[in-house]
């Protein structure tokens, strides 16, 4: 009964936390192993966000009995990516506060000072994760939207 009343926002927060957990574990492992500075290492986090967004939209559609409005699915996908990205960014800031050497791998140039470099990097993580979730939600909702919901068409009014 409670599952049928699940909201898009609650589903997004729930799946955002579920998505953040493997991203945080992977980031900590990458920092400890010394390959956090490789650009390719960050691409796995993008794949994890894409997977989390699609699973969140799919779950909400299943819970709603395959009657999912476009904006509900779009919203749950964005919230999923935003929550996961904020948690990953906070983990990055915490990691930077605990172990400067681990985060130093990421800095190409220290243009704004060491503290601001960590701050900007965390904000960049949030921005990239959120924009990835927006694009993924747009694409996924073309597949998961309700079948009777047609594309908006321009109608001639005579």
Where are these regions (language model features)?
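Membrane-water interface at transmembrane helix exits
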Residues: 26, 30-34, 57-61, 88-96, ...
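Internal alpha-helical transmembrane segments of multi-pass membrane proteins, especially GPCRs
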Residues: 13-17, 75, 79, 119
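Alpha-helical transmembrane segments with an aromatic anchor "belt"
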Residues: 61-80
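Transmembrane alpha-helical insertion/packing segments
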Residues: 1-63
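Hydrophobic alpha-helical membrane-insertion segments
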Residues: 76-94
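Short, highly charged, low-complexity non-transmembrane loops/tails of multi-pass membrane proteins
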Residues: 147-158
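Hydrophobic alpha-helical transmembrane segments
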Residues: 115-136
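Short, membrane-exposed interhelical loops at transmembrane-helix boundaries
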Residues: 101-119
């Amino acid at each position: 009964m409670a599952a049928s009343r699940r909201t898009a926002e609650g589903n997004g927060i729930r799946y955002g936390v579920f998505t953040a957990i493997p991203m945080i574990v992977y980031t900590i492992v990458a920092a400890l192993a010394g390959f956090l500075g490789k650009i390719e290492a960050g691409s796995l986090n993008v794949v994890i966000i894409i997977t989390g967004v699609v699973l969140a939209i799919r779950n909400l559609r299943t819970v709603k009995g395959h009657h999912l409005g476009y904006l509900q699915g779009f919203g749950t996908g964005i919230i999923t990516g935003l929550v996961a990205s904020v948690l990953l960014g906070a983990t990055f800031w915490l990691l930077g506060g605990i172990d400067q050497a681990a985060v130093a791998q990421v800095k190409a140039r220290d243009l704004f000072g060491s503290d601001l470099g960590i701050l900007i990097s965390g904000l960049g993580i949030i921005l990239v994760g959120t924009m990835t979730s927006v694009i993924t939600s747009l694409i996924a909702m073309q597949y998961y939207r309700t079948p009777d919901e047609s594309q908006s068409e321009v109608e001639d009014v005579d």
